Each structure stands twice: as C-alpha cells, then as structure tokens.
A protein has these predicted regions:
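ACP-dependent fatty acid/polyketide chain-elongation machinery
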Residues: 1-68, 245-257, 352-366, 409-413
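Active-site-adjacent elements of ketosynthase-type condensing enzymes
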Residues: 45-54, 111-115, 194-220, 262-282, ...
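Active-site-proximal alpha-helical scaffold in enzymes
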Residues: 79-92, 141-145, 149-193, 231-252, ...
Length: 413
C-alpha cells in the first residue's frame, strides 16, 4: 500500500501530576502549574532526593472494576485510564470497527518496580515458594499494551516499545507507521510509567540524574544555569491515531495531523547523549524530511528538556546543528518544567501538549527558567506566546542513545 496514508489525531487522554484528564492537564499547563512535592509513597529520610511529581487523587475504580484493578500494577492502571479517556474522546465505537484493524502501541520504560520490590521482600523473608504467581504478569512492561487491548477489545497489532525516556515518542511513531502502511486503521498509542519507588529513586539518585533540590520551584528547571537533575514524574498519556479517510467517514473531530517521524541512535554512551548533538539532530531532520517540511518552516520545538546539565547543553547543540542560524528564530520549551520527567510516558505527554498548542495557538512557557549559561543562547520560552503554530516538533532522548522526534501540523483538508 505504501507510505501514503495520512494519519490524524482524533482522541486524547492523560493522567498526569497536574491533572487527571487532558482538560485539567492543559489548564494546568496554561496556568504554569507545577506538580512537584514531597514524595509520599515511602519515607525519604535516608534519601538525598525528596521531591517527585506524583499523580494525585487517582481512583482506578473510575475506569475499571475492582477485580481488574487488582490484576494490574499502577503503570497499567494509568494506561487503561488514559486510553479509556482517549477512546471516549474520539467517539470510537468498537462495535462498529473491525477489531483486527484497531491496534495498540503503549510502552513503559520500566514496568512495575513496585511488584518487583514487594515480591523480592517476600522472597527474602519467606522463601521462593511464597513469591506470588502474579509477579511476572504484573511486572513486565508489555502488560500496559496487553491490558489496554484487553480492556477495550483491540485485536490489531499490539506493541510495547521500551527505549527508556524515548518510549512514548517511539510508541506513537511506530503506531503512525503502522497506519501509514495499512496494517491498521486506528491505533491507540502512548506511554505510561509509575516508578516513584525506593529502588527507582535510589537508582536514579546513584546516577546523579535526579535533582536533590528541596525547593519545588527550583527543582525541575530545564535550560536554567542552576539546573542539577530531573524530577521524577509518573502518569500516562494516550492518543487515538487514525487514518484520515477512516476518521472522516465516521465524522470524527480531528485535532491535528501527524506527518513526520524520525529516529537515530547516538551509539555513544549508556546514559549520556552524544556531546555534539549529532544523533538528536539527525532524528529531528529525519522527522522534518518525512513530513516534507523544510527546517526553516518550523517555528516551535517541544524539547526533551530534562533539567540535567548534559541535556540542556547537548540538546541545544543538536538544535543548532540541525537548524543552523534558524535555531535562533525557534521557540523552544520544556513541559517537564511543570510535570517533571515521566520517563516512558514523557514523550506521550509532550505529544498531547503539542496537539493542544497547535489547536489553540499557544506556546507554553518554561516554568522556573531565570538565567542560562553562555552556550545556551536560544529562545527557551521564559514567557508564553499566543500565536499560530503551524508545525510542532517534539523530541525525546533516551538512555542508551535512543533519539526520536515527531512532527505534528495543523490539520487542513
């Protein structure tokens, strides 16, 4: 069939640290609301990291029965909830669809550390015979896609991408390709994560990847000269991607069009991005080429923007390498300045952000940004902007050198 089918966004759902729906999340973004606060899941007395961006007031009973909830860890519950919102938002009636042409591409970077910690404690205290039979199906990361498919009767291609912090973006990109090539008419796609646990916080702290600031206003500050690590977040964002003619036939509302997907690998280091930014630059240019858009046509980038020292420096170099002098004309922001780093869900949350920005003609500010160092001399959006957003490019860069970019455009016939 070839790569000639247009793909549009027709539904969205979100469970985030600043709101448990797309509407709540987006209102929070426009208000500059941050989701950072003391970790409540466990006692952090012995931990250097005290803050996280936790989801608040999440009730799985709103989205599933008690039996289903007991058979899912929180990362799966988040995904099923966000997927339900997205499917409802899209007005997708599975009784009217060929279920084998509706697929699922929902990734998690880690899966359930909670299940692993809980059952490891049981192993050490009571022996191997007392480890729960549900450990594996509760823990493994592909169960997000599995549970979403089970919950909503999705019998088409089912994918679980695991590329660390690029997971959500790759998941949406692979769903896009699936529709382009005719293997599905509709894909439920995105990412989910719930890793604010003792071992999760301890492990990322040992990497010196997390911010140790105890001031919520100065913890996640992408591109700021005082940035010192990311704040771990949690949640899920899921979108409904649909082949254009299929969407039009059923009278679906169309939020935006997904027109480009680019990837690369740094092949450089297990945690650090390539210092010259060449890998991320290639992913961005590949997405633009895929979408038939010249670099100088782009006006806005939703950056990976984690608030680590390396990311701020190396992603800036990547943007300059990809766009040359035009880099200075771009508006660049980081959604992580408000919700922290949702790891495998980050790219999906930022994709939803870009869709809303295109829809409303609004570019949010990078909250907490005060002053940058000399090499970080681009426009990182200290202020928000009300303006037409014809295209939005969103970047995700994962441990292991995984780079992915998606290009969205304002939908026109």
């Amino acid at each position: 069939m070839g790569k000639n089918r247009r793909v549009v966004v027709t539904g969205m759902g979100a469970i985030t640290p600043i709101g448990n729906s797309v509407e709540e999340f987006w209102n929070g973004i426009k208000e500059g609301k941050t989701g950072f606060g003391p970790i409540t899941y466990f006692d952090t007395a012995d931990y250097r990291c005290k803050l996280a961006a936790e989801v608040k007031d999440f009730d799985p009973a709103q989205y599933m029965d008690k039996k289903s909830a007991r058979r899912m860890e929180q990362f799966c519950q988040f995904a099923v909830a966000a997927a339900g919102q997205a499917i409802s938002d899209a007005g997708l009636d599975m009784e009217q669809e060929d279920p084998y042409m509706v697929g699922c591409s929902v990734g998690s970077g880690i899966g359930s550390l909670q299940a692993m910690e809980r059952e490891y404690d049981r192993l050490k205290e009571k022996g191997p015979g007392r480890v729960g039979p549900m450990l594996v199906p509760l823990m493994i990361s592909n169960m997000a896609a599995g549970n979403v498919s089970i919950a909503y009767g999705l019998k088409g291609k089912s994918l679980n991408v695991v590329t660390a912090c690029a997971t959500g973006t790759h998941s949406i990109g692979e769903a896009y390709r699936t529709i382009q090539y005719g293997d599905a008419d509709v894909m439920i796609a995105g990412g989910t994560e719930s890793s604010i646990t003792p071992i999760g916080i301890a492990g990322f702290s040992a990497l010196t990847a997390l911010s140790f600031s105890e001031d919520p206003e100065r913890a996640s500050i992408p591109f700021d000269k005082e940035r010192n690590g990311f704040v771990m977040g949690e949640g899920s964002a899921i979108v409904v991607l649909e082949e254009l003619e299929h969407a039009k036939r059923r009278g679906a509302k169309i939020y935006a069009e997904l027109t480009g997907y680019g990837c690369s690998s740094d092949a450089y280091h297990i945690t650090s991005p390539a210092e010259d930014g060449s890998g991320a630059a290639t992913a961005m240019l590949n997405a633009l080429k895929d979408g038939g858009v010249a670099p100088e046509e782009l006006t806005y980038i939703n950056a990976h923007g984690t608030s680590t020292h390396h990311n701020g420096l190396f992603e800036t170099r990547a943007i300059k390498l990809a766009f040359g002098e035009h880099a200075y004309d771009l508006k660049i922001n980081s959604t992580k300045s408000m919700v922290g780093h949702l790891l495998g869900a980050a790219g999906a949350v930022e994709f939803v952000t870009c869709v809303k920005e295109i829809q409303e003609g609004y570019i949010h500010r990078t909250v907490g940004l005060r002053e940058t160092e000399e090499e970080l001399d681009l426009n990182y959006c200290r202020d928000s902007y009300k303006e037409e957003v014809p295209y939005a490019l969103t970047n995700s860069l994962g441990f292991g050198g995984h780079n992915a970019s998606l290009l969205l455009k304002k939908y026109t016939e």
